[in-house]
Amino acid sequence: MIKKNLFKDFSRFSFVQSSIKNNVRCHSKLKLVQPFFIKTKQERNKKFLSSYKFSEIQLITIDLASPEKIKEWAEKKLPNGKIFGQVTNPNTLHYKTLKPLKGGLFCERIFGPIKDFECACGIQKQKPFNRIISFQNKQFCSKCDIEYTWSDIRRYQLGYIQLVTPVTHLWYLKGMPSYIRSVLGAKKKHIEAIAYCSEIVTIDQAWKPNRLIPFPETISSVALSSKKRNTFVNKEIVNIQLTYNNFKKFNVNNTRSLYVSINKKLFKKQFSNNSYNCTCVDNEIQNPIFFLKYFNINFLKPQNLKELKVLYINPDFYKVENYPYKNQVKFEFYQKICRSFIKTSLNNHKPIYALNYLSHSFLNSKVKIFSHFEHIDIHTMYVFNEEILINRFSNLARLKKNGKSKKKIGYIHSKKIHININKHLLYFKNKKLKNLQLSNNLKLIIIISNNASLNYFKNWSNTFNCMNTLILKMQFVNKKLHFQYYRSFFNTHTIERVYFNFFSLDYLKNSNFFVNFSKLLALNLLKFMKSNLFNIFIIPIPTILDNFIFKLSLDSQFQRLLNSLSIQKQKVLNSNSVISKSNKIFKKQFFIKNFSLYDEAIEILWQRFWKFGYYFTSNNMNNKLCKIITKFNKNNNGLRSTLPSWLKLIKKLIKKTQIDKKSNQNLLNFRVNVIHTNTQNKFSLFVNLIKIYLKKVLFLFQIAPENIKNIYIKKSIFIFQELRNKNFKYRNFRTQIKKIVIKLFGLELLPWVLSQFIFTSKIFYQFQKSKFSFYHNSNFLTFSRRHSGRNLIKKIKESSFLNFQIGVNNINTIFHYKYSFNCLPSCHIPNYKCRQKFFIYKNKIENILKLKKFRLFFNIWLSRFLKNNISVLNVVVNLKLNNINSNNLQTLNLLFYQKKWLLKKKQIFYNYAMLKEFHSKLLIVGTLHDFSNFIKLIYSSSYKNETLINIFSIQIQPFYKFNFIQKIRKYLNSEYYNSFDSGRTKHYLRKFLNKDSDNLFFKQFNYVYYFILFSSIISTQTIERGSLTSLNNQQFFLNLLCFFKLAKKNIFKKYSWLTSIQKYFYSRQIIKYKKKQQQKSMLKFVKKKTFFNKFLDLINSFIYDYQKRLKLLKKHSIIQLILKKKMYIFYFLKKLQNKLINEIQKYYFYEFEKKKFINIEFNLNNFKNIVIFMNLKKKILFLNSVLFQSQTNFFNKHANLNIFNNSYNYMYIDFNNFLSIGQFWQILINIFKNKINKYYLLSRSLPFIISNDYVKIDPLIKKFHDDLKHQVCFNSFLIKLTFYNSTLLYPLQNIIKNNNKVLQTRQQYYKIIKSNNLFLTNYFKKIRGNFTELSIKKFENIHTIVSCIGYFGYQDILYHQIRELKKNDYFRNFYLKFIKHDLSNNFNEAIFSVISESRISYNDSIFWNNIYSLSNRYSWKSDIELNIFLCYMLSPETPSDILIPLYKQRIHSSNVLREEPPIAGGGIILKLLKELDLPEMKKIDIQLQTILKKIPNKLHEIEVLLKHNQTNLKLLKYYSLKRRTVIEIEKSILRKLKYIRRLNWVSAKPEYMIIRNLPVLPADLRPIFKIQQQLTASDLNRLYQKVIYRNDRLKRFLKNSTTSNSFEMLFAQRMLQEAVDNLIENGKDINSIETDSRGRPLKSLGELLKGKKGRFRQNLLGKRVDYSGRSVIVVGPKLKLHECGLPIEMAIELFLPFLIKEILKNKYALTVRSAKIYIKKHRIKITQLLRQVVKRQPILLNRAPTLHRLGIQAFLPKLVEGKAILLHPLVCSAFNADFDGDQMAVHVPITNEARIEAWKLVLSRNNLLSPATGEPILLPSQDMVLGCYYLTIENLQSLTQKKFRINRKILNQRNYIFSDFEKIFIAYQRNQINLHTNIWVIFNNTIESDSILQEPTEIQVLFSGQYIKVYSDYYQKFNRNGKIYNQVVRTTPGRILFNLMLNNCFN
């Protein structure tokens, strides 16, 4: 700051603060008596060891002092607890005794004792010997509270006056410049008027300068109010914390949840044809994750907003968006929605709210108009936005045609349009689909390039209507554009993504799919083949079907297609057609160049159908195969281009090779089919893989490679046909072969290939028996018609080949799984959360699990659950953590690309399927979650030292007694099993299970852990013994028993499992018993241990006979059973959970922010144990629920962990999907679909079935909160509890408020109400009344359940729809009756009367809201609070608002409505300054910068206009005025920027410019003393007294309520302001000067500081300084400008340390003392050394007074004799020096920084111009001017009248002519001429002379044509052409000398 500001800061007692190294904060008010000797000896030694404390000097800062800091300086606390420091009494001394008065301006308690170590009582203490010791133990008088210390303390001890209302600081208000004015951006007179209470400020006035916008419509507009409209959000929004702590006067949460959305201006852009932004389709289908935006905006961090592309659509949007093309929209349903949506939004005049979609496709595509949902689940989510997108899609072509309309539209189209249609849309749109059962997450995705015309879409919509499959359709018209686009598309995605990631395969659950599929196939293929445009038509390969049926159906379709195409049509499709051409172009330009793996993709597709291929090559089918091939060959030319290229592989099925039986009779007999692939491809990964595995096979069979030459054909695919047992030598051979096959088909390259592998041909024969031969034209169609729907499923199930009915995707799943398939009826179909990767596994496992993390994790579990369980220890045999070698795991790609087996930057998912070996004919596949078969070993390069991180997926499976397990193991260890008849099994089961079922005894859970990496089990020996087999079967049975245990607890589970368990016992292929005895014992065993029979008949009747089931429901009361079962609630194992979170924070996430939970969600859907799953690739952390069973209830919870990083805004964790209830719902849906209601999909309604008992949730959440509160900061208002899609919101504040105990009076109970006749709605809500009702379906006789939320939120059911049941009733009364009617007797308390202690009636207390009253003078602490309050109060009604029947005032404390002092004067300015916190200042900074950038353009425009309007005076005047104002604005903005940035740099806040605590100067600095028997007092005491008097007066006014708002009060406040002003600077305002009795103005603080005798100049600046000297200055004319002469004596003294250093360095002396002696003795040597030192060392010269910055300049010293400093005469004017005895001071800069600054900044030759005026300051004067004049004078005699003695001889000679200058100087040195002799010299350069403009005196013309012009000073000779060739000039030697000197200077 400039010196003036420095004075001001000092005057505010913002004393110099220096932070010293040892973290002691030290202020300059510290007493001189109190130095730093107080510290310990060590610290003291440290201090004195350092040579100098320059670093500490650098740390000194000058700040504004806060009121708290002033208070801290002034106050001192006594041992008895009393605090002194505040001056309350205006009196000074007693008039008689002259002793200080208590609490007054000289009080000894505040300022210290008058005499050393003597108190007011007169008691003296002995003075200490050492003054320092006294500060260690302070002593006080117990009577008068005065400290025993030195009286010097009165010179340093401050006091303070506490002002009633804040007062502005005079210098910051009225100073020049006025800081307060420029920071607030208001006019000075306005702010002064406010400060001096001459104007009253209303809300509007306070509002206007800060807010340019009208009243806010949304809270988000409040949050973003200060940002500039066109700039991006993520630069400007800083973290705004809006929690309920900000709202002390009202509680927003009680009526409704407040939601915040981010608004962002939508830019208007035209369509750019060339921009093809290819979106990432990896997560295309994954359900976009959303969250409720409660009242915490901590997700608005800038780094997160990069991904949060939420659009804000202007209200103007509606004017543009008239939907002019709605007649073109095919779907009436969409029209309705659009209309209703637009109507509602138009009526309310509100903006649409944007919902953030985090799936990548929506992040990147710019067409986003989503509603902002209050509460939503995954079912309702898509409905709104898809219809909007479809509407856009239908309008697209028109928009492109009408170029004009582009500019008007305010939204952006992306180049691709995604249409996601979920089940509701499909259902409502298409009546044909009403019989279908659509899975929960079915979506149709169509990706269409922009070139699709509307007509084409119309034609295509017919197929669209019946479409139940998924299509990827891409068009190619403009070749270059599209190839470029397609290229980028394929480059960015792997094969697998291209073919599969667009598609959700859930629809395959639908039984009718097979019927419709073939029709669609034929339709589409024909259509696409006929179209002129080339279309790629890719059909997703249904993994669940194992592609068998699908493949056959395709073949039949193509055969039909070939037959149906006539020859004429084939001619159309000949090689000249558009299609074939484009196909060629496409293949050339795209696949060959850019997608080298295309052929591999073809091979992969072929591999997908390997079973079909196997079937093909069996002996029965060879003839058919030949027929097909011949047919294809006939049509080869015509159809080559259009058929999918993988069918070409069939054409090239050429060779079958057999190994010669004679050469290897004892060995394997098998066939190999070789398929030639496209020869264009140079390299095939798959072929190489096959070669490697074939080598292994050959090695196993001991076959020489020569015998199988035919197999080694390049570009070949290898297919196993048959393996027979006859010729095998070894028992374990088949398992070895299976391993190889599994490896072959379990590659990472082929993630969708099933791991199961069927070797025998029996199954195919079974298929033939079941009429599964589809090779003829219509076989498949006839078969599928005959066995439509579930019959087909049954057939396939019975064949034990595949099962695709059970639980492909559960209803409750939010995540979509890409790969879902089933291997056996007994297995659950695995639901994959991530891509499953298969890896090769070597036999030996060593050293993978050395990590502490796993040990820690494992030991917790082991110690807790495995201690007493011997069987478990048997299972976990040899699990040594150091036995596993990481080198034995690797991906297949590494096999070829790296010779070494290294793990680098790959996630490893280790699949159990590798290890499962069975003697049975089928292989069970291990899955990700079920049966704990899956271990995830995660490896990532982002961790330190590239270590392997292991997090195990452990599933705890409950089972029973130890002997029970032993029996199972014995039973399973038997080697062979025989099949048994399914009917007999059923009979046995029923017979045995009906007995003794009630006598079952269930013990508590035990827990088993299955780890897959067993070190010793996996070896050839164990495989031979068959122990691995037993392990796997045991695994299955344990899981089976888990079911029985769970089934007892939860009936839901039973439904889902029973069918599969029955199948397990009935199926032939799965278990084969060796003997009937074993069979019987097993059945008995099962009978004893289960209560299976209890529900068997029930379930059968439930499934097969719906009518009977209805009666059974009433008799057996299943629903009651269900409802009686309470929710089992798991909770976290505290230790493990803490450790887990800590581990994750330490090792895994660098960005992981502790204590950041956006939202806590509890999910009660699963009754499951732990799965911890981390996908570090996407940085998503999944923490599943909880880890063990307690004796109390279970609670399964999940939290939204907020991990801030670039890719995701928050964490979303959901674990709905393990052994979830989804399968139960699946069965029920099948039943209900067929029996109850064909017109509605029940997946939405069924989840409402829930417990009839209430759940006491408070203690559970309390427990959860206590567990997590140390790790997590709960920022959200509510906790979301999810019960099967119905959501309860729980207010977290109840817990936070009462951390110690839960309030018993207001415990929350949640009653789940059931109703027999209720409207269920599929709906969604939008905040601002944009409500669209999608469907209302009525259900009768179905027990549906609605969740009611007590007092804090919205309902799941729309109450205005419930009201429609009885329209006549008043809504509240009806609803109360409705609830009362259905309340059961279980409730001990009235559940909903949670409001008051003194309850109102039970009926009246369901919905309530608090009444909070605000004082009419209530002032908001910040602008944003007022905005939010207004936003909340003024928000319009929405259909989802609930009527609040009554209000309850709940403010009991009188303190809340206490009268606050009114705000006036400085208080208002304080309020305004308080709003300028750091985030706000940053925003202002950005805003000012943006304005500044525009100003130059504005000025340029004005300049241009000024030039154009030179003639028009009016305009000229107007624009010049405008220019002046713009320049003024620029100056004021720059000034404001400077202050704001300065405030940002220092720790001071703007509000510190307002005084709340006025410091009182120490008593000795304003003394009262006697002079000649009279008392003389300092003027300051009078001024302080005035302040105290006026402060007390204002206090009295404010205490009295009658005067607290009066004009008297305002006047008193003004008087206080003036008193403080006069104290700081008396006389600033002429009207309010304080004077003494003589009328002389009193001296204020300002006068003490300023002036020559002021505190700074006299006391601080006028001190002696080290390394300085002083001497008289003398002129040094021979010096250069940057040099000065320094006397040698002075130089030796100044540079003494440097000299000594040099002496010691050169070893002239050994010690410092001897060096000093050396200096005295050896003077000559020392001067030499000194000259070396001085060369590189500048010095600073200063002449007092230093009035401007040129008063100190740096020079290079030159050593001179004498005692005076030599100074260059030109420098004198800068110093204002002359040589009449002036003195100057010399200073030596010591540090390197000071020297650098001396050289660069203050060197004299760098200061040639005056900094004030810019004029040159080094002007010659006196002697220099005289010398110049003397040199250049022409006539010496004209100098004076007095005649000099002149050499007459020289003077009279006037005819000297010289040819050059050298001869002139030679003549001058010989004394032939003097300086003033007139001479002539030949000089051909240009000259200046008076006679140039005159006429020549004569012209001489020669006969040769040359001529001479003669002037008085020179003459010129010209040639014939008139060019000068010679010039002779008359001058003097002095002038020549001067000219040469000037030239030398310039050159």
From Swiss-Prot:
Database matches in InterPro entries: DNA-dir_RpoC_beta_prime, RNA_pol_asu, RNA_pol_N, RNA_pol_Rpb1_1, RNA_pol_Rpb1_3, RNA_pol_Rpb1_3_sf, RNA_pol_Rpb1_clamp_domain, RNApol_RpoC1
Binding note for cofactor: Binds 1 Mg(2+) ion per subunit.
One GO biological process term: DNA-templated transcription
Regions crossing the membrane: none
Catalyzed reaction equations: RNA(n) + a ribonucleoside 5'-triphosphate = RNA(n+1) + diphosphate
Annotated binding of Mg(2+), by residue: 1778, 1780, 1782
Keywords of this entry: Chloroplast, DNA-directed RNA polymerase, Magnesium, Metal-binding, Nucleotidyltransferase, Plastid, Transcription, Transferase, Zinc
EC numbers on record: 2.7.7.6
GO MF annotation list: DNA binding; DNA-directed RNA polymerase activity; magnesium ion binding; zinc ion binding
Known function: DNA-dependent RNA polymerase catalyzes the transcription of DNA into RNA using the four ribonucleoside triphosphates as substrates.
Name of the protein in question: DNA-directed RNA polymerase subunit beta'
Naturally occurring in which organism (per UniProt): Oedogonium cardiacum
Lineage, opening ranks: Eukaryota, Viridiplantae, Chlorophyta, core chlorophytes, Chlorophyceae
